[in-house]
Amino acid sequence: MKKNIHRCAGCGKTVESEKIVIIDNKPICLACMYGQTIPFEIYPIGQVRNELTMKKKDFGLSGPEGISCIDLLPSQKRFMYKLEEEKFLTIVYYLHKTKSVKSIFKRGLDRKEVGVFASRTPHRLSKIGIQDVKLVKIEGTTLHVEGLDAVNGSPVLDIKLKWSDLSQ
């Protein structure tokens, strides 16, 4: 089986597809992006279930807003102790539909030209999304939440109590 090979726009080395990221429509190898840092694995604890999808063009999501379900793996039940007593949570999830990154673009919120770190774009190098949500109810290991902007099928990495709720 033939592997796709790309020439890095940063250093000129040839690398396999799985060892590059596309930034501003140019292949950049992981060595140019991350230097000597050591990659690590993160395992999902569940998955988002809703009707949201990424828009084909422009910015944002498409689909009905409202309640999303977070289907946690059965193994996560033990970590849900007294979760139903909380009103607001922070959901950390993986932006699994992101294909490429633009370093500078017009922000969807106000069309201001900004870099990735000055935005909420899903097109990020880390592919990590974070969203505060309202907990509506829990059924077994399924959380029903309001305000989640993750698309259907997004792997959930972590759930935390919303920070501002700790200070009240």
Language-model features: where?
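Mixed-charge, low-complexity intrinsically disordered regions
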Residues: 1-129, 141-168
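Conserved positions in beta-strands of structured domains
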Residues: 49, 133-136
